C-alpha cells in the first residue's frame, strides 16, 4: 500500500485520489516512484491532514485522518520515494556523563527511523516492516549483522538528521543503510549498514525471501545499488573471528530485563550492544570513545537466558577504503574482539569487534 498524507479540501481530495488510483492501476511501480508525496499541516489554512491509502490489489482508495504521530513526526519520504529522512532532538536521557549521545542512543535512532520508513510506505505497524505476504506466513525480519561508524557524537540538544533506505541482499536477506548528519551544518557525523534475514515466527527457523515478499518491498528500493560504505575493502564486510578462551576481560551472568524484549518477543538487537560494552576495560571507557562497532547475530536470546560477555584486545586492522575511519588509526586507538555466549552451555549468541579512539580534548 501507498500512503499519501496531504492537506486538501474534500472536493480536491476526490479529484486527486481518482487520479492517483487510475495512475497506480496503470503502472504501479513507476507511479510509486514518481508520485509519493508528503504534505504537512499549515496553520494558515487550518486544514486537517488526511491519509489516502491506495491498495495494490484493487486500486481502491481509502480516506482517513492522519494520526497525531504522523503530524508530529519530523520525517518524510524523499522526493523520489526511495529513501526516508527524519530529524531527532537528542534528549537528556539519551546522553552519557559527557553530555553526548551514547552508541545505544544512536542504534535506537537507527531502528526508529527504519521502522518509520517502513510505515511511511504502508508496511505493518505490528512488527518490524512486515509485508502482507509476511504476515500471512508468520514471517518476520531479524538482524544478521549491524555495522555502525560514528565520526562525531551529537550532544544534548543537537538535532540529528538520519536518512535510510533498503535494498535486496542476495536471495536470503535484505540490507538497510543509514547516513547521519548534523541538521544545522549538514556535516556527515556517522554511517551504518545492516543485513536482515527472514525468520518464521512460529518455528524460529530462517527462511529464504520469496519472490512475493521481494516484489512487495523492491518497489520502494533504489534500482541501482546505493551503499553507505564503498563495497571494496571496507570494515563493514570484514569477517569476525570467534574469540577463544581465555578472554582478557569478562562480565559474567548478564540477564535480559523484561524491557529488553522487542515486539517480536526476542531480545532487542540494541541490548546486545550494551552487553558487549559491559566487558570493555574501564580505563578505555575513561579515555576513549567508540568509533566503530560491528556485530554478527548468531542466535536468538530469550528472556530467561543468562549471558556472558567476553572481550580481548586485538591487533590493528587496516583502514576502511572510503569511510571516515580510513587511514586514521593511530597508536592511541584500541581495537577489541567480543563474544556473547550463554552462561550454561557456552552457545554463541553474538560476535563482534569495536574500534575506540581517544576522546577529544574538552
UniProtKB/Swiss-Prot annotation:
Residue stretch of the organelle transit peptide: 1-38
Transport recorded as keyword: no
Protein's UniProt keywords contain Hydrolase: yes
Active site: 264, 266, 301
Polar residues: bias regions: 315-331
Biological-process GO terms, alphabetical: fatty acid biosynthetic process
Keywords in alphabetical order: Chloroplast, Fatty acid biosynthesis, Fatty acid metabolism, Hydrolase, Lipid biosynthesis, Lipid metabolism, Plastid, Transit peptide
GO CC terms, sorted: chloroplast
Localization annotation: Plastid, Chloroplast
Catalysed reactions, semicolon-separated: (9Z)-octadecenoyl-[ACP] + H2O = (9Z)-octadecenoate + holo-[ACP] + H(+)
Region spans: Disordered: 312-331
EC number: 3.1.2.14
Group of enzyme by EC: hydrolase
GO terms assigned for molecular function: fatty acyl-[ACP] hydrolase activity
Family of the protein in this entry: Belongs to the acyl-ACP thioesterase family.
Function of the molecule: Plays an essential role in chain termination during de novo fatty acid synthesis. Possesses high thioesterase activity for oleoyl-ACP versus other acyl-ACPs. Substrate preference is 18:1 > 18:0 > 16:1.
Name assigned to this protein: Oleoyl-acyl carrier protein thioesterase 1, chloroplastic
Organism for this UniProt entry: Arabidopsis thaliana
Amino acid at each position: 500500500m501507498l500512503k499519501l498524507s496531504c492537506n486538501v479540501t474534500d472536493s480536491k481530495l476526490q479529484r486527486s485520489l481518482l487520479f492517483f488510483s487510475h495512475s497506480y492501476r496503470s503502472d504501479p511501480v513507476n507511479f510509486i516512484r514518481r508520485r509519493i508525496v508528503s504534505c504537512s499541516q499549515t496553520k494558515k489554512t487550518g486544514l486537517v491532514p488526511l491519509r489516502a491509502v491506495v491498495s495494490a490489489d484493487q486500486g481502491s482508495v481509502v480516506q482517513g485522518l492522519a494520526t497525531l504521530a504522523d503530524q508530529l513526526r519530523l520525517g518524510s519520504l524523499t522526493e523520489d520515494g526511495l529513501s526516508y529522512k527524519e530529524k531527532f532532538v537528542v534528549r537528556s536521557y539519551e546522553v552519557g556523563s559527557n553530555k553526548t549521545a551514547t552508541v545505544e542512543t544512536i542504534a535506537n535512532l537507527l531502528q526508529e527511523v527504519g521502522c518509520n520508513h517502513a510505515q511511511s510506505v504502508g508496511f505493518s505497524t505490528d512488527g518490524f516492516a512486515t509485508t502482507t505476504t509476511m504476515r500471512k506466513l508468520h514471517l518476520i525480519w531479524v538482524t544478521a549483522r549491524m555495522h555502525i561508524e560514528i565520526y562525531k557524537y551529537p550532544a544534548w540538544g543537537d538535532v540529528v538528521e538520519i536518512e535510510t533506505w533498503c535494498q535486496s541482499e542476495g536471495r536470503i536477506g535484505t540490507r538497510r543503510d543509514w547516513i547521519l548528519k548534523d541538521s544545522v551544518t549538514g556535516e556527515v557525523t556517522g554511517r551504518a549498514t545492516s543485513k536482515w534475514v527472514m525468520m518464521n515466527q512460529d518455528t524460529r527457523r530462517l527462511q529464504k525471501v520469496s519472490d512475493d515478499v521481494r516484489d512487495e518491498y523492491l518497489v520502494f528500493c533504489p534500482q541501482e545499488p546505493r551503499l553507505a560504505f564503498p563495497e571494496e575493502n571496507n570494515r563493514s564486510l570484514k569477517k569476525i573471528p570467534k574469540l577463544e578462551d581465555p578472554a582478557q576481560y569478562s562480565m559474567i551472568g548478564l540477564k535480559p530485563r523484561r524491557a529488553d524484549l522487542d515486539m517480536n518477543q526476542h531480545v532487542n538487537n540494541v541490548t546486545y550492544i550494551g552487553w558487549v560494552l559491559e566487558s570493555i576495560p574501564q580505563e578505555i571507557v575513561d579515555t576513549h570513545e567508540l568509533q566503530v562497532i560491528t556485530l554478527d547475530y548468531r542466535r536468538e536470546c530469550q528472556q530467561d537466558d543468562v549471558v556472558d560477555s567476553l572481550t580481548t584486545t586485538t591487533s590493528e586492522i587496516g583502514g576502511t577504503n572510503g569511510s571516515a575511519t580510513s587511514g586514521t588509526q593511530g597508536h592511541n586507538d584500541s581495537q577489541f574482539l567480543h563474544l556473547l555466549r550463554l552462561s550454561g552451555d557456552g552457545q554463541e549468541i553474538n560476535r563482534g569487534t569495536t574500534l575506540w579512539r581517544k576522546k577529544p580534548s574538552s
